[in-house]
Amino acid sequence: MNDSEFHQLADQLMLCIEETLDGFSGDSDIDYETNGGVMTLTFENGSKIVINRQEPLHQVWLATKAGGYHFDYREGHWYCSRSGEEFFTKLSEAATAQAGEVVSFS
């Protein structure tokens, strides 16, 4: 993958997250802000999830209350470099824990 392909895939990922949050109809208030390739989700309880691009590695990194995760793109999805877990599965799990209600990304 070259840098251009990486940016296109990372942009698609961020857009999908934005669209999910814009359409979220739960009780929790989840705000997001994107600045310089870094997306920060802020929850009512003050906790945050940070998603950022690591261009030199062609990875997307996810930082949650539970820990940090690095994701590589393969076979049409972003997968954790340690556990093999898919990005949206891990993000949904973390957002649900931090929001106190089900938040589902796909």
Curated annotation (Swiss-Prot):
HAMAP family: CyaY. Disulfide bonds: none annotated. GO terms for cellular component: cytosol. The gene is cyaY. It comes from Yersinia enterocolitica serotype O:8 / biotype 1B (strain NCTC 13174 / 8081). The keyword Iron applies. This is Iron-sulfur cluster assembly protein CyaY. Belongs to the frataxin family. One of its GO terms (molecular function) is ferrous iron binding. InterPro entries: CyaY (IPR047584), Frataxin/CyaY (IPR002908), Frataxin/CyaY_sf (IPR036524), Frataxin_CS (IPR020895). It comes from the Bacteria. It holds the Pfam family Frataxin_Cyay.
